[in-house]
From Swiss-Prot:
Has a single-domain beta-structure, folded into two very similar Greek key motifs. Palps of larvae and otolith of the light-sensing ocellus. Keywords: Repeat. Residues 2-42, 43-84 form the Beta/gamma crystallin 'Greek key' domain. Pfam families: Crystall. This is Beta/gamma-crystallin. It comes from the Eukaryota. PROSITE patterns: CRYSTALLIN_BETA_GAMMA. Monomer. Structural component of the neuroectodermal visual system. The lineage of its organism: Eukaryota, Metazoa, Chordata, Tunicata, Ascidiacea. PANTHER family: BETA/GAMMA CRYSTALLIN, VOLTAGE-GATED HYDROGEN CHANNEL 1. The gene is Ci-bg-crystallin. The keyword ATP-binding does not apply.
Amino acid sequence: MGKIILFEDVEFGGKKLELETSVSDLNVHGFNDIVSSIIVESGTWFVFDDEGFSGPSYKLTPGKYPNPGSWGGNDDELSSVKQQ
């Protein structure tokens, strides 16, 4: 099982959301279109700009992603996450 932590602000600041399962709509957790940094503690994850695991996606492996540029995305656009 993997774990990903999403943060509202760059450099791991603001509100955070810890997940261990895929989420097709981050709005359920109040995290739609606000993610600005990510820590992947374990597993491989795909993050998507649109809900329902659609739109542009980015593959993330364990590590720290302090800003959207570090995963190749744009600020405040993520809407779903899927564990591989």
